[in-house]
């Protein structure tokens, strides 16, 4: 909140792009200060070459994986801007912004939480797999309706929120939302592989995926000369990434292909039905703002109702977890009635 106030204040003062710099630096400073105050650990003027050697043998692969991923992502925007111009780049980036907004914070949370938790049971592959399955099922159950719902309401959302001048970004929004749909799954798989000390595998996957992605990117830009093909290429590269992670999950922790599909498909299938339903609502003859509100309400009611009627595993798990956390007696009773014994 403080960093946002600083950024907005600097923008009103007319400092231009420096407002973003001020907001970012303020946010980083406050984060560091809060961690310093709340954490008992303090750095000491000591250095262990033995520990540094152990950390570097593992950490350089993780670092290089992140660098390769970042370079490939920035290269795509750079080439689109150079080859097709700022307008096409703006439509592409706008299409990526909203699904990225939904997924990025969740993905960061998954990375920060999953790695230390999974590392504690790295020697117990059965428990490790069980925790991965729970994370995948719950993550896809929560995210699929948001992302597939965004695909369903894309037309009314763009017009109502951004205005009609952004209509050309709708195809990119739909395609790139599918890209982000599988990110939590691949992130969970990545953290499980890292937790057993196999950072070499995540580096291998990232290199292969990015070689494929760059090859598709150049074909889309210089062969097909289409930004839309760039978006499809991004989706294809994500499918390759997902396939490789599925292979290594099966190989390393015994998370079989059948189990992975069993965990992914229920949430995605229900969300797809919801997406089709909310998309049909756009034909109701009312203004775009009201249509968007109606789509969101109908979609949410449909998703929760079907989850309740079918007693989906992730729905039951979340309700039981909320029941345990709730201190309100009336709320507990309501939640308990939602789970059929």
Model-based region annotation:
Residues 17, 33-78, 113-130, 251-266, ...:
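Interhelical loop/hinge segments that connect adjacent transmembrane helices in multipass membrane
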Residues 65-70, 214-218, 271-286, 337-338:
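Hydrophobic alpha-helical transmembrane segments in multi-pass integral membrane proteins
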Residues 24, 58-66, 70, 74, ...:
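Residue-level signature of transmembrane alpha-helical cores of multipass secondary-active transporters
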Residues 17, 54-62, 79-100, 129-131, ...:
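Interfacial/gating helices of multi-pass transporter permease domains
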Residues 91-207:
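Specific pore-lining/lateral-gate transmembrane helices of multi-pass inner-membrane transport
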Residues 250-257, 264, 276-341:
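Membrane-proximal transmembrane or re-entrant/amphipathic helices at the cytosolic face
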Residues 2-30, 200, 207-243, 255, ...:
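Membrane-interface helix-loop junctions in multi-pass transport and translocation proteins
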């Amino acid at each position: 909140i403080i960093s946002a106030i600083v950024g907005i204040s600097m923008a009103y003062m007319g400092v231009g792009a420096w407002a973003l710099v001020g907001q970012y630096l303020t946010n980083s400073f406050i984060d560091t200060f809060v961690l310093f105050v709340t954490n008992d650990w303090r750095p000491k003027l000591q250095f262990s070459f033995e520990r540094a050697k152990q950390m570097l043998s593992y950490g350089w692969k993780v670092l290089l994986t992140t660098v390769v991923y970042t370079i490939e992502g920035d290269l795509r925007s750079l080439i689109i801007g150079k080859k097709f111009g700022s307008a096409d780049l703006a439509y592409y980036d706008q299409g990526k912004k909203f699904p990225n907004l939904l997924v990025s914070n969740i993905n960061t949370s998954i990375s920060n939480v999953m790695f230390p938790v999974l590392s504690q049971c790295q020697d117990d592959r059965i428990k490790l797999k069980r925790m991965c399955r729970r994370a995948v099922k719950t993550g896809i159950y929560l995210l699929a309706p948001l992302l597939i719902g965004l695909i369903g309401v894309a037309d009314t959302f763009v017009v109502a929120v951004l205005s009609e001048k952004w209509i050309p970004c709708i195809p990119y929004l739909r395609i790139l939302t599918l890209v982000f749909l599988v990110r939590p799954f691949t992130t969970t798989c990545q953290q499980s592989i890292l937790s057993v000390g196999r950072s070499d595998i995540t580096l291998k996957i990232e290199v292969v995926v990015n070689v494929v992605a760059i090859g598709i990117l150049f074909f889309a830009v210089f062969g097909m000369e289409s930004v839309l093909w760039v978006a499809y290429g991004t989706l294809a590269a994500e499918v390759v990434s997902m396939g490789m992670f599925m292979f290594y999950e099966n190989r390393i922790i015994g998370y079989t292909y059948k189990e992975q599909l069993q965990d992914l498909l229920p949430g995605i299938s229900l969300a797809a039905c919801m997406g089709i339903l909310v998309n049909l609502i756009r034909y109701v003859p009312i203004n775009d703002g009201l249509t968007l509100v109606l789509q969101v309400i109908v979609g949410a009611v449909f998703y929760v109702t079907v989850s309740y009627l079918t007693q989906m595993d992730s729905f039951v798990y979340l309700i039981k977890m909320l029941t345990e956390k709730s201190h309100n007696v009336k709320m507990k009773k309501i939640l308990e009635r939602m789970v059929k014994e």
